[in-house]
Amino acid sequence: MKRTTIAVIGVGLIGGSIALSLKRDPDIRIVGFDVRQDFLDKALNTGAIHAGTTDLQTAVREANVIFLAAPVEQIYAILESLRNLDLQPGVIVTDAGSIKTGIVNHAIRVIPDHVTFIG
């Protein structure tokens, strides 16, 4: 059986907790992304993620699921970036943002057709 790859975008408290929980499943591979190398180092050292990167394309390239766990204002920019990246067909994108209407409306406008957004 092929492992499911989940990209956790933002490995701070929320993203790190999500990653730790998901990593309990041996069939899931967690790739963490953060702009802060110290957050990635902590996530790797605590075993929350299998791999970490500061390059968004590297984080999402093989992902079956992309979990956005960044501050709301950054989620908008990340959604914009995702539309220009090489994503797996059928990839699911979801978020932990506290403001749903704005994020969902923005995702509808910018997410490519081969991507499913669950807000």
Feature map (PLM): residue ranges:
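Short, conserved clusters of charged catalytic residues that mark active-site
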Residues: 51, 77, 102
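NAD(P)+-binding Rossmann beta1-loop-alpha1 motif at the extreme N-terminus of oxidoreductases
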Residues: 1-61
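Conserved short alpha-helix immediately C-terminal to the canonical SAM/SAH-binding motif I
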Residues: 39, 74, 100-103
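Rossmann-like NAD(P)(H) cofactor-binding subdomain of soluble oxidoreductases
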Residues: 81-119
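Short, hinge-like loop/turn segments at secondary-structure boundaries
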Residues: 48-51, 69-70, 109-113
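Rossmann-like NAD(P)-binding element
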Residues: 56-87, 91-92
